[in-house]
Amino acid sequence: MESVKNAKRSYEKEYRQKVCSPVEAAAVVKSGDCLCFPISVGEPTLFVRALAARRHELEGVVINQQHHLCPDYFTEDSAPHIKVNAWFTSHVSREAVQKGWADFVPNYFHEVPRLLRDYWPVDVAGTVVSPMDEHGYFTCSLSVAYTMEAIKKAKKVVVQVNPQAPRTHGNCHIHISEVDHIIECDEPLASLTIPPITPVEEAIGGYISELVEDGSCLQLGWGGIPNSVCKALLHKKDLGIHTELLSDGMVDLMLSGAVNNSRKQTHTGKTVATFALGTSRLYEFMNENPRIEMHPVDYVNYPHNIGKNDNVVSINATLEVDLLGQCCSESFGHLQYSGTGGQADFVRGSNISNGGKGFITTASTAKNGTISRIVPTLAPGASVTTGKNDVDYVVTEFGVAKLRGQTARQRAINLINIAHPDFRGELTEAARRMNRI
């Protein structure tokens, strides 16, 4: 008993010795260093702001990150001092990537930990963590993804301890002995406002819910369509969740009993995710919740792990679909808008799954109905996020197009049938010119 108490006192002493200010932590970074920060809500904002404040003292610092929050170093004058490799562009990094002040790194999300191991040095890693427990462990809280791998490889580790960060279960723990510097803060976590569901999103959610069977295992993203799907699935039974992103709509499914994870072949009884983003309600629900497990992205998003569960249903959004079924979900022509993320991982995982179904969703039009999202060919320079051989279903507010197992001719017909009526004529003419129909 005494040795346990001594260990606890030792952890507390070590913790106190490592506490520092954000400015002191930022002083650890040297010119030429490579840094790695977690996706979105896991970004240690106080550390990042302090680092950005001294950027003109540094040269050739590189930051690798998936999705960014702090805008301070995404400027033309910052690039020689701190250059960002964006693995997924956000509203913060998009302009910098397009103007060459930052770089974009194409990737499959499940491969990021391996890329860290094999290609990218990590001199300093920083992350938000939940408070330390009596055994000396923090958790990565809402952003596990590649965080554990970055910490494992880093020469120096900075954690930002926030009591508002939920303590999560799964493979997401960091011991005090792995940490070099501790920043304490108590600030609200980055959150999202849930927009009202539009009629278009409600229609798409309704079509998908009709094809989701009891006992299915779900992956959904964030936004109006996933929220609409979650609402439409509240009457289902024995659903499971194995997802990249955990969102508010999934909380409703769990609280209603529609999700109990009882029919999953892996992690039976548990909801599995690699990061979470939503409202404070989601974060409160996740805190110390034994029904939710957070695991690294190379496990969660690995297609063959996804496919170990039967009846996987993946639901992902796209920006543009051509008449063969190629989906561009990340760029407008050559202008990078976001990234592949986990879309390709889960589309492939659902294809591997026994009884699995993959849904690619989009409104039929953009820009107030002036542009069709279903097009004869993708725009010049567009990235193919999900290839034609992987796409199963495409869904708009006008219906569902089955593509998997269909001829090129039938694919074109099915896609034209779910395009906006205003564009079906010109799509049909284009398809004939290309000998698609």
Curated annotation (Swiss-Prot):
One of its GO terms (biological process) is acetate metabolic process. It catalyses: cyclohexane-1-carboxylate + succinyl-CoA = cyclohexane-1-carbonyl-CoA + succinate; cyclohexane-1-carboxylate + butanoyl-CoA = cyclohexane-1-carbonyl-CoA + butanoate. Keywords: Transferase. Homodimer. The active site is at E244. Pfam families: AcetylCoA_hyd_C, AcetylCoA_hydro. GO terms for molecular function: acetate CoA-transferase activity. CoA binds at G221, W222, G223, G224, I225, L319, G342, K367. It comes from Geobacter metallireducens (strain ATCC 53774 / DSM 7210 / GS-15). Belongs to the acetyl-CoA hydrolase/transferase family. This is Succinyl-CoA:cyclohexane-1-carboxylate CoA transferase. Acyl-CoA transferase involved in the anaerobic degradation of cyclohexane carboxylic acid (CHC). Catalyzes the activation of CHC to cyclohexane-1-carbonyl-CoA (CHCoA). Benzoic acid and cyclohex-1-ene-1-carboxylic acid can also be used as substrates, but with lower specific activity. Shows highest activity with succinyl-CoA and butanoyl-coA as a CoA donor, and lower activity with crotonyl-CoA, acetyl-CoA, glutaryl-CoA, CH1eneCoA, propionyl-CoA and acetoacetyl-CoA. In vitro, the enzyme can use butanoyl-coA as a CoA donor with greater efficiency than succinyl-CoA.
